[in-house]
Structures are given as C-alpha cells and as structure tokens.
Amino acid sequence: MKAIVFVLIFAVAFAVTLRQGPIVCNLCTGLINTLENLLTTKGADKVKDYIDSLCNKASGFIATLCTKVLDFGVDKLIQLIEDKVDANAICAKIHAC
C-alpha cells in the first residue's frame, strides 16, 4: 500500500513539473527579452530593481521562475545578457526550459 501511495505521489509531482515546464520556459524567455531591453536603456541597477519588484509580489509560475532566477544569481544573469547570449540558452542554463 505504501508503495502505491509513493508511486502516485511521484507521478503527480512529475506530471505537475512537466505541465509547468512550457509555461515557465515561455515566461522565462519573455522575462529575458524584457531584461535585455531594460539593461540597454536603463542599466544593471534597474534590472535588479525590476527583478526584486517582480519577485516580491510573485506567485504561481512567476514565483517558480523567480526562484530559478534568484538561485542562478542576478549578476550572472545580467552578465549573460550583456554577453548577448540568446534568451532560450539563458533559460536553459537556469533550468527554466
């Protein structure tokens, strides 16, 4: 019985992860594109402010994305954007895609 419950819990957790994958990936690439524009026009400090503001009020899929971004590191993220790394590649690096 315990084995069946464990398998069911694992299956549900795996299904939720798969389902949120494309959503978080799309949110990530959109966020990276926004941050790229913000970095070009306003600078790194504004990018950090934007991420702080977004993540402080985030929930759901956006909170998931914020966790991935913050775990990766905002300074490293900014460096990748400055190095003109593609949004899809950045999101893959932070495990959002």
Curated annotation (Swiss-Prot):
It comes from the Eukaryota. Disulfide bonds join C25-C97, C28-C91, C55-C66. Residues 21-97 form the Saposin B-type domain. It is found in: Cytoplasmic granule. The record marks H95 as: Essential for homodimerization. Keywords: Disulfide bond, Signal. The keyword Signal applies. The keyword Zinc-finger does not apply. It holds the Pfam family SapB_2. Gene3D superfamilies: Saposin-like. Its main location: cytoplasm. InterPro entries: SapB_2, Saposin-like, SaposinB_dom. Residues 1-20 form the signal peptide. Forms pores in the cell membrane of host cells. Implicated in the cytolytic activity of the parasite. Pore forming activity is lower compared to the activity of ameobapore A from the pathogenic strain HM-1:IMSS. Monomer. Homodimer. Hexamer; formed during insertion in the membrane. This is Non-pathogenic pore-forming peptide amoebapore A.
